[in-house]
């Protein structure tokens, strides 16, 4: 038989392309070992990694490295010099002229012109007064004046402004020069990265039970101790980056370097973060780099008089669904701006990482609109992927983890893009975690569409365990999304209007309240135990907060009634909210002791449709759930991997959790060498209806 013909010169087959990709991406072989289905897309990972490496190389060649490049906030904006002068710098490539005005100049718009530099940059030096004090004192108001090429005179806030305020009933924000003589000094070191991440998703403004905007100081004094007591070791702060529209929930950013002044001063936010650190709690910022507000007078939009500057020009620069502007991630100065923003929050405020909002919108040119992701790998590669945005995310993760190796980054991505949470050295996105966004949808679907006796145990387990191998997920039963007006929290789906009338401990349990309290605990525990490598709860949901969240707006007559968290409900000893709060606390504290979130994925030994039971093992614990609305089971056999004596360590039916006390916690359960459900040992337990148990092998513990 004749030998096969050699390939023509320059021709490359699939094997040759794979070899080339493996040669270019340092740890791609490991990624393809983890997920062999990615092999046909090796060239995509090669291209992404080479582009990422090229940008890093170019930054090194032209800027002296990413360390220097990400310090844009040290020169852009306005800064006090050692001689008492003021140095100002802006990037406004479309401007005809740039000027600084403010209280210091009597608002003369043209008295202080900037000098034009290369690449669209402008700078200004303002000498000090004769006594060497700065001409622009701390707390004074400023504006950048732009003269456009069409002759317009535009008043703007610097994109690098550190503090902006809106006074009285003004429509727009004022830029305030923030340079206090005695800035806050951090007293406590950053906690180490938790081995298990238990996140308390928080919004400072709604953290009071009163109908008003709460302050950083209120949150520090009143909410941080609650979070610590509940056993959470991480806070995710929403709506910190300044946003002109309060009802946007912080997702229409106008000033990216300014901490929202609604809640207080920058120094008070620093005190909040520092106090959390003193409690051993890490703090994540909900960072919004997926889009920006359309505001121009107090936002980035049209900063230099053009529709481009920081954003794509034309239709590509607008998000049709969000009505906001979209960054041009391939722009050198946009990269400087966004990477410097990452560094600013890490260094100036000592945040410990980020939850990146709207990642799906960034990753794809279609922004996820009208797309149903089926899991077909072809959906994650090709022309629909915005590789410039993906490269930016790789750079942002690289920067955060280079500066602070214990930094935590979480991606909000509904698409399930493969390798998003793999290291950049593998060609991945570099995130530490992704949000398990299908889980809350599953719980809402079950509560809306199915009777309890029709819940599919296998489908619940599938949803909770359906995650990419070695890509960590943050599981949650509900987040702020489910609390917003128009939706319902789990507690409200379960108990609805009876929450207003039948939550008193002095009244007998109604069937609705009984069902609601028992299922609320079970849903949260099985999500916590089976759903991921991290867990998230939105503030107030731990105790079954009874109302949705609705910020003041025209549609509700600017009311703050629903823009609050009624922590007073769980503090009232005569109300049943305390039971849910107690369970959430003890669930977190048990995880802290046993570490199931940092343990390998659970082994599910039973998902019995007729009995409505689910059992699994994780971190040496035996989790047992009976979702049946009416059937209890005596001497129910449960499989386990180990012999020995087991004890109950968490029981949702306990009195302190609003249960019916049907289990004796002094009972010992002995696992014998009796194979069951694929496990070599098994034990017999009593599992009442609508009860969740965790058993621990005390022999192994000892």
UniProtKB/Swiss-Prot annotation:
Source gene?
Answer: Gbe1
Q: What is known of its domains?
A: Binds its carbohydrate substrate close to the active site, but also via regions close to the N-terminus; this may result in increased affinity and therefore increased catalytic efficiency.
Which SUPFAM superfamilies does this chain map to?
A: (Trans)glycosidases (SSF51445), E set domains (SSF81296), Glycosyl hydrolase domain (SSF51011)
Q: What class of enzyme is it?
A: transferase
In its UniProt entry, the species of origin is given as: Mus musculus (Mouse)
Q: Which residues carry this modification: N-acetylalanine?
A: 2
Listed A to Z, the keywords are:
Acetylation, Glycogen biosynthesis, Glycogen storage disease, Glycosyltransferase, Phosphoprotein, Transferase
A single BP term in Gene Ontology: negative regulation of neuron apoptotic process
Listed EC numbers: 2.4.1.18
Asked if the record carries the keyword Transferase, the reply is yes
Q: Output this protein's name.
A: 1,4-alpha-glucan-branching enzyme
Q: Name one GO cellular component term.
A: cytosol
Kindly list the residues the record flags as site (Transition state stabilizer): 481
Write out the function statement from the record. Glycogen-branching enzyme participates in the glycogen biosynthetic process along with glycogenin and glycogen synthase. Generates alpha-1,6-glucosidic branches from alpha-1,4-linked glucose chains, to increase solubility of the glycogen polymer.
Residues annotated as carrying Phosphotyrosine in the record are 173
Pathway stated in the Swiss-Prot or TrEMBL entry:
Glycan biosynthesis; glycogen biosynthesis
Description of how the protein assembles with itself and partners? Monomer.
The entry marks the following residues as binding substrate, namely: 62-63, 91-93, 118-121, 333-336
